[in-house]
Amino acid sequence: MKSFLKYTLATITGIIIASILFLIVLIASLSAIVSSGNKPVSISNNSILVLKAGVPIPDRGDQNPLSGIDIVNMTLNPAPGLNEILHNIEKAGADNKIKGILIENGLLPAGWATTEEIREALLKFRENGKFVISYSDYVLTQECYYLATAADKIYINPSSMLEFKGLSSEVMFYKKALEKIGVEVQVTRHGKFKGAVEPFILDKLSDENRSQIKDYAGSIWNQVVADISKSRNIPAEQLNRLADNLDGTLASKALETNLVDGLIYHDALVDTLKTLSGIKKEKDLNLISMTKYDKVPDPKMTVSGKNKIAVVYASGTIVDGKGNETNIGGNYYADVISKARLDTSVRAIVLRVNSPGGNAIASDIMWRELDLAAKAKPLVISMGNYAASGGYFISAPGTKIYADPMTISGSIGAFGLIPNLNKLLEQKLGLTTDIVNTNKNSDFPSVFRPMNPYEKELMQMSVENIYTEFVNKVASGRKMSPEAVDNIGQGRVWSGTSALKIGLVDEIGGLKDAITAAAKLAGVETFIVKELPVFEDPYTRIISQLSGEVKMSILKKELGESVKYYNMIQELKSMTGIQTRLPYFIDIH
């Protein structure tokens, strides 16, 4: 027996030691890969920069040290962010070693505003006398085609297809599904256009929501058509006819209607690139990825100096507390903005907003620090794909607001949402709860019972108060009357183009324009761009990332298919309380 215990304990000890050693080796290996990825590189003459469409493009390059790691080849290939893509395109325009840009097109889950910014950068790149070629082997989606029209020539595979059909918005409604699993969503709201709650309480779009979606989708489409018309020299009326009839779907029809310039295979593309680069042998063709080119030093980049422009990236849903890299923690970002305000070397702040909104109190906490910052130094707002509801709330104090023509903005409104999980827990899962209160409403708000009339009235009052505050703060920031803001508010969503017309933004432009404006307002000509927030060190983040993956793996294993209910409940829990949030479920494609 003693011998058995001895060997058992030895085995367990060995497993523990081996696991610890494996973890140490794994972390060391990952750290080595991350460190090696930061070394500067050089490129040869006649190089071609490759813009590979096919992965999501965040406003800021992925700060996750595990992102893009190829364990087999021990390399780091993170997806570049919009900031890196724009900088690389501008840098390549002045780089004598770069002959042109190849857009490897296909799927582009980037958002219309992001795509438009990249497209404008490509058009400016061409002004340097360099070429831009777009090629797609498979289906060229509509968003990708819009990007491709910035190129000198558009080529697609003879067997591929092109998507050109106009915009569509599909909204999924959860009401019946929630009823089936026993979840009741209790809603209060202000704003007849506040459509964020509709998927939980309706089976289809309200007339007001349908109208606003049609308006802002129409505004975006008109911009797309106008830009393509200018680049391809095709009248807008003809483009709309092509979209109505799906005439450009087949490759042969796309060529016939001048939507593309040629139907070629990849070997012919290589020949084209060789000719444009002035080389004879394919082995001398030097294609450079965005990730690699980002490590090429920029001779024009200021590396030192006393003047800084802080660019604060605020992407994702606004939540309370610290948040994480996929959302905006109100308290954390307030602290980041406060430090930028107090830093005398920071001459101006640019807030890059790409958010559908979120928690009302978290938005207000951020607003306060942004308002203080705007009183201390220039605060310029740059709006990405979304800057709506809470996203617009935090933009309101801006000295100057820039939006893309295709930005989804506005949505000045508020709503409250509390799920009642009583039936789900009791009837579906067999769980019951009992409550002991010291006072009448001690357990409010509770997800285990429905609200009583008094609580509903209290929630509505809270929503009304938040809406009034929202309107007043926008009125103050935009130098408008509260009545004027209310007229364009009520939860209504606007495109960037429309927002400019009604005074919600000052200029149409992208992130680069906002940074330039901030420097001008601050009276500085040379400056360093300081990107914020600065996240925790790679070693801490690697461990955190690994633990997060383990947690989700365990949940999936234990819950199986029921993990979808867990995810749904987590989403509902995050929306508990008063929200200033866009109906982000809406996808325009």
Model-identified regions with their sequence ranges:
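Short glycine/threonine-rich loop-to-helix capping motif typified by GTGT followed
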Residues: 361-365, 498-501, 543-545
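Extracellular/periplasmic catalytic domains that process cell-envelope and extracellular macromolecules
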Residues: 42-45, 301-306, 427, 523, ...
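C-terminal long alpha-helix characteristic of the crotonase
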Residues: 230-231, 261-305, 415, 471-477, ...
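Intrinsic disorder and flexible/low-complexity segments
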Residues: 300, 304-309, 313-340, 344-345, ...
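Acidic/histidine-enriched alpha-helical segments
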Residues: 241, 353-358, 386, 412, ...
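Charged, glycine-interspersed solvent-exposed loop segments at helix/strand-loop junctions
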Residues: 175-274, 422-502, 506-508, 512-517, ...
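Cleft-lining beta-strand/loop regions that shape enzyme active-site pockets
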Residues: 40, 49-171, 300-424, 464
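N-terminal type II signal-anchor transmembrane helix
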Residues: 2-42, 46
